[in-house]
Regions:
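A structural signal for short, well-ordered beta-strand segments
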Residues: 1, 47, 86-90
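Conserved long alpha-helical elements within nucleotide-processing catalytic cores of c-di-GMP signaling
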Residues: 4-34, 40-44, 48-49, 55-65, ...
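Short catalytic/binding micro-motifs of nucleotide second-messenger systems
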Residues: 31-36, 68-81, 112
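Cyclic nucleotide signaling catalytic output domains
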Residues: 39, 66, 80-81, 87-117, ...
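A structural signal for hydrophobic residues in beta-strands of small regulatory alpha/beta folds
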Residues: 50-51, 92
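Conserved phosphotransfer active-site motifs of two-component signaling proteins
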Residues: 54-55, 97
Length: 132
């Protein structure tokens, strides 16, 4: 998961505002995913989520839709107001894939969303192909 246009937050409003948006994003992620799921910040404006026991593709879609909706919002304080959205790349675990394969597949799907529309999600084609 990547925040859309986050660089502008830091560039226009400063790193304190950016840090506040990142902290609030973490709280939103925690509130949307189940207690059995795992979410964390990788760095910058990039987050990773592990959704445990997703029953099927539709369950992952529902989770992604909730996340996109919850993160498409205006963050405000006395000093600033900025609207941020999120793009998400999804890769279902089939079994046997390495973390590198899963990460690369999700990253490709994420950047396809960012390239074509932003504020949405896309499933990866496959994570089973070897990483070169």
């Amino acid at each position: 998961l990547d925040l859309d246009h986050f660089k502008e937050v830091n560039d226009q409003l400063g790193h304190m505002a950016g840090d506040q948006v990142l902290q609030e994003t973490g709280l939103i992620l925690k509130s949307v995913v189940r207690s059995t799921d795992l979410s964390g910040r990788l760095g910058g404006d990039e987050f990773v989520l592990f959704i445990q026991n997703a029953a099927d593709r539709r369950g992952l879609e529902r989770c992604a839709e909730k996340l996109v909706s919850a993160l498409n919002r205006t963050f405000s304080s006395a000093e600033y107001s900025v609207t941020v959205s999120a793009s998400i790349g999804i890769v279902p675990v089939q079994g046997g894939e390495s973390f590198a394969q899963l990460y690369e597949a999700a990253d490709k799907a994420l950047y396809e969303v960012k390239r074509t529309r932003r504020n949405g999600y896309q499933f990866a084609a496959s994570a089973a192909e070897p990483v070169l």
